[in-house]
Regions:
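An acidic-aromatic loop/edge-strand motif
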Residues: 88, 93, 98-114, 161-163, ...
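Extended acidic/polar, glycine-enriched regions
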Residues: 176-179, 243-323, 691-732
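Accessory beta-strand-rich segments of carbohydrate-active enzymes
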Residues: 3-18, 22, 30, 38-39, ...
Length: 1019
């Protein structure tokens, strides 16, 4: 065999993407016998995970040449773990960038070219001996970022690109007796890097499993399962295409067992030839869906011509149909709604080299929060994800490893020229198709995958259209998705997207559905009022950067109102930040720029509904509610249940009716509801009678039985109803007060308390209760919040900056004191605010003999001022007052546009737990619809704030300005006080996007007349 030499210059050749790489195939496992299969131990596979010898170089010029030679001693090198990113193992720097390519600003490159100054090279070496009895030896690299060259015993074996699908090679011709030397060189940047410009941390290295494997004499190289329902979804048809490694005679024993261990098929097929097809009918088939992920267990036992078992293949099979019915996508005949999330393969400790246990943990979180769909943004994931999605029940959009927005999205404008990748450029055509083939061939047998995606934000053009056509031809059972089809309807003259009719678009057929990202609800409605030839999904929406996801219910409500709108995928699942320890040994989450990486996009990777360690954020409370499959509308006499599931009867759950009086549970009953999927029904009940008070009826559906992702009793849906029973208020005797008027202060004293107002400083300066001073600093009016990421993205802090100054700087222009005998005393301050035009706020304190201080804040609208981020007051208490108890919406924080998932009740928490560890400190901890709010020390001493009208409140260890000044949580000092905030209401958090979309107008606290009344009292 003629020896090949690797030509390093081909790294910059976009037509060179695979050399001697084996064809892609299905990801099935195979075992030598039944015992192996039961123990999941493959004797025909040998893992190469573990320590490899390793050498790092900054660029091609400084790499070690000749290291692959058999006599080059690499055993004196350092070692590195595999699988892992080299940057997570201390070699080079992690870099986070969104659109810009990593070399932008360092080297000026045309498309396909690679950097010369900074192109980290990772050289790996592993020594091994061939297991006894292995005649053929192959090696599989499940994921290498971004390109790799392979040698065995000094001989060049092959080359491969595509960081996210397997690269496999035949090592047999290069083997020697005894010890063999496997050498791999991994290049961070190759021409393929132009196709892999995803919005994520830029790593390199061998980051997925590596293993050797052999094949038996007779072997299934590939199988393609087609399992579809028929006869009006009552029965099933099974057809399986087999590709064999030779044409020898063989036998195939097929056994199919359902999820109750009933044998459905048990037969033997005699085969000759390199291909074969197995077909069978299945009566009374149990269909697969996200609601009922019914899987049949197949075992394919392969025997040679002498009837010896040579391999056994286990395979899960799900019967399901996903198709376009007219202009509606349907699963098993029912209109599907995607309650989805985008999932980057990322963990703060491992990067994209995620252990399998972490994958299962992610799916648990999703199921617990009613998520039914995953988009693998923007590359094929570890095969384990799809295996588990089949079992858990998720609808998956499997996305090709391609994103090129750095080649054409330039500072907010669109560029279409020779550097736009891939567009119609013929030299990218085969590389683009190769990525599609590698994904489809590996993943095709997973029932959970219902859509193939052509990548993300890679412009339009013929190359991507041809990819979509490949998907359709190779697998007609699935639909094809591509969001950037919009760039195939660009008006060439203006350079702007126009919503042209289909016959005016270049490649309208690329995507089977209209897919857009971050489109506002009103825009979706407008689009669908004109263009109804395809269903509409949001492949990315409700951008979850920091404190976000406001207004999400507008989108989920639209799925009920507009049949063509079939849901969306939240951006995204987990914050992307990297864990380290600081100089003091504290845990730190680092984002872009923290490693000295430039260019970078700083904290723009913090878009998760879970944090970087995959702990839940408070945003999940809203996601769970908006994604629930059942709408429960309770009343005083019964509950209406709208069953929005596709296949599930409510009788699968217990219906729990609970009654609370003034926040305390007083009654509960378990019922059963029998309402079919897609139907609406009512369940009656009779509530017990209690006295006057505010009542909350909570209706919940909870699991009757435990699942793999939740315990029995887990709540899947709830609804609440609030009503009030009036009664005669008890007249309480008013204790007398004493007013002390001095030269500089006004004192008000009563039984067990005292209040002091400064005539000099013009503010409330003291409130003592039971001899304890509760006010550490003067109460301050507050019109500001620590800007959230969405605020910064839309420029809200700049637009409303006057209100920050108004919160910090005021001037009292009038003070009035009045008494109502010995029953109450009133002190009224009029403050001029640091705004232009000048605004005034009147703060009135009324003290009564029971120790209550009533506060009234009044503002008269001043024309010319912007909207007001918040309207309330801050109280600073000692730091040991860190225990919170409140009657309002909880348990997680909520905002006027993100409170659908909050429950009205009494909750307890702490000031530290109310801090949400977003990558950048920002506003958090707010609670809406509060009746009363208590902050105490551990002995129960403190203050209660209440109001006759529901208000908003929070208690944190920091004030808004301290939060705003910090870029990381370690910038915040150890807490020295507790800041309690009472508010008439603040801005909603927004979330349509995080780079320009403001909070929806209805959730903005506008510049208008305002009145806020509340009272506080020591406890």
């Amino acid at each position: 065999m003629e020896e090949k030499i690797f030509d390093i210059s081909k790294l910059a050749d976009s037509t060179y993407f695979a050399d001697n790489r084996l064809p892609a195939h299905s990801d099935h496992h195979y075992y030598a016998n039944e015992e192996e299969m039961l123990n999941e131990e493959m004797s025909m596979r040998q893992s190469l995970n573990g320590l490899w010898y390793f050498s790092y170089a900054k660029n091609l010029a400084s790499r070690i040449e000749g290291f692959e030679k058999a006599d080059y001693n690499c055993k004196i090198w350092d070692t590195i773990r595999v699988p892992a990113h080299i940057q997570m193992e201390g070699y080079g720097k992690p870099q986070y960038t969104n659109v810009a390519y990593p070399w932008d600003g360092h080297e000026e490159l045309n498309e396909g070219e690679i950097p010369t100054e900074n192109n980290p090279i990772a050289s790996y070496v592993k020594y091994f001996t061939v297991p006894q009895g292995w005649n053929e030896v192959f090696v599989s690299f499940q994921g290498v970022d971004s390109a790799m060259a392979l040698w065995l015993n000094g001989k060049f074996v092959g080359y491969s690109e595509d960081s996210c699908t397997p690269s496999e090679f035949d090592l047999t011709p290069y083997l020697v007796e005894g010890e063999n030397k496997l050498a791999v060189q991994v290049y961070r940047f190759s021409s393929a890097s132009w196709l892999e410009d995803q919005d994520f941390w830029r790593f390199s290295g061998i980051y997925r499993d590596v293993y050797l494997y052999t094949k038996p004499q007779v072997h299934v190289d590939d199988l393609f399962i087609h399992a579809t329902p028929c006869n009006d979804y009552k029965d099933g048809k099974l057809s399986i295409d087999f590709k064999w490694n030779n044409e020898n005679a063989k036998k195939l024993a097929v056994k199919l067992v359902d999820n109750e261990e009933n044998v459905v098929i048990d037969t033997v097929q005699e085969i000759t030839g390199a291909t074969s097809v197995f077909t069978a009918d299945v009566e009374n088939v149990k269909l697969w869906s996200a609601e009922y992920p019914n899987l049949y267990k197949a075992t394919f036992t392969v025997k040679d011509e002498n009837d010896n078992v040579v391999e056994i293949i286990p395979q899960n099979i799900g019967f399901r149909e996903f198709k376009m019915d007219g202009n509606i996508m349907k699963i098993n005949g029912k209109r599907i709604v995607f309650k989805g999330v985008n999932r980057h393969e990322f963990d703060c400790y491992y990067g994209r080299a995620i252990p399998e246990s972490k994958i299962a943990h992610d799916l648990d979180i999703m199921k617990l929060n009613n998520i039914n769909a995953i988009r693998t943004s923007h590359y094929p994931n570890n095969s384990k994800l799809y295996e588990l999605c089949d079992i858990y029940g998720f609808y998956v959009i499997d996305e090709t490893n391609m994103e090129t927005h750095g080649s054409w999205q330039i500072r907010g404008s669109v560029r279409c020229d020779k550097n736009t990748v891939p567009n119609d450029h013929p030299h990218w055509h085969e590389a683009v198709l190769d990525r599609a083939k590698s994904m489809l061939e590996r993943d095709k047998n997973h029932a959970s995958i219902i859509i193939w995606s052509c990548g993300n934000e890679s412009y339009g053009g013929k190359n991507i259209y041809d990819m979509s056509e490949y998907f359709r031809k190779a697998d007609p059972s699935r639909l094809v998705h591509y969001e950037s089809i919009c760039w195939d309807r660009v008006n060439e003259a203006s350079g702007k997207m126009v919503l042209a009719m289909p016959d005016e678009r270049r490649y309208d057929g690329t995507s089977d559905m209209e897919s857009q990202m971050y489109t506002k609800v009103a825009q979706i409605k407008g689009f669908l009022s004109k263009y109804r030839e395809k269903p509409f999904i949001c492949c990315e929406y409700t951008h979850s950067m920091g404190n976000s996801n406001g207004g999400m219910h507008k989108y989920t409500d639209l799925t009920d109102e507009e049949p063509l709108y079939q849901g969306g995928f939240i951006w995204d699942f987990a914050d992307q930040a990297i864990w380290t320890r600081d100089l003091y040994g504290n845990d730190v989450m680092n984002y872009g720029g923290d490693f000295g990486d430039r260019p970078c996009d700083y904290n723009f990777s913090g878009n998760g509904i879970v944090f970087a360690d995959h702990a839940p954020t408070s945003k999940l409370q809203e996601v769970k509610f908006n994604y629930q499959n059942f709408t429960l509308v309770p009343s005083e006499t019964g509950v209406k249940i709208i069953n929005k599931s596709l296949f599930t009867n409510t009788s699968n759950y217990d219906l729990i009716i609970a009654l609370a009086k003034n926040g305390k549970n007083v009654w509960q009953k378990k019922l059963t509801a029998d309402i079919n999927a897609g139907q609406t029904g009512e369940v009656a009940y009779t509530l017990p009678t209690f006295g006057a008070g505010e009542y909350v009826v909570t209706a919940s559906l909870v699991l009757k039985q435990a699942t793999i992702w939740a315990n029995c009793g887990h709540e899947v849906a709830f609804g609440q109803y609030v009503f009030t029973k009036e009664g005669k208020a008890d007249k309480k005797a008013v204790a007398p007060i004493k007013v002390v008027k001095s030269d500089f202060n006004i004192g008000v004293k009563g039984e067990g308390f005292s209040v002091m107002f400064s005539a000099d400083r013009k503010m409330l300066t003291s409130y003592k209760y039971n001899g304890v001073e509760l006010i550490e600093e003067f109460p301050k009016m507050n019109f500001w919040r620590a800007p959230i990421d969405n605020d910064n993205g839309c420029g809200m802090p700049f637009d409303t900056a006057q209100w920050k100054l108004a919160s910090m700087y005021t001037k009292c222009v009038d003070m009035q004191v009045s008494e109502n005998g010995n029953e109450s005393a009133t002190v009224k301050y009029t403050y001029e605010l640091a705004t232009r035009p000048v605004a005034h706020v009147v703060v009135t304190y009324t003290v009564t003999g029971d120790g209550v201080v009533k506060v009234d804040m009044d503002y008269k609208k001043v024309e010319g001022l912007p909207a007001i981020p918040d309207f309330g007051m801050l109280f600073t208490l000692p730091v040991d007052y860190d225990q919170i108890k409140y009657y309002g919406l909880g348990p997680c924080d909520n905002y006027i546009d993100r409170k659908e998932g909050g429950k009205l009740g009494i909750f307890t928490t702490t000031t530290q737990d109310e801090i949400q560890p977003y990558l950048v400190p920002q506003e958090c901890g707010n609670h809406c619809d509060v009746r009363w709010f208590e902050v105490t020390d551990r002995r129960g001493r403190g203050v209660r704030i209440s109001s006759a009208t529901p208000f908003e409140a929070s208690a944190l260890p920091y004030n808004p300005h301290e939060l705003e000044n910090a870029r990381h949580h370690y910038d915040l000092a150890r807490p020295h006080h507790t800041v309690v905030r009472a508010s008439a209401g603040m801005y909603g958090v927004g979330g349509d996007d995080s780079w320009g979309a403001p909070t929806l107008d209805e959730y903005i606290t506008k510049n208008e007349d305002k009145h806020f009344s509340f009272e506080f009292k020591g406890i």
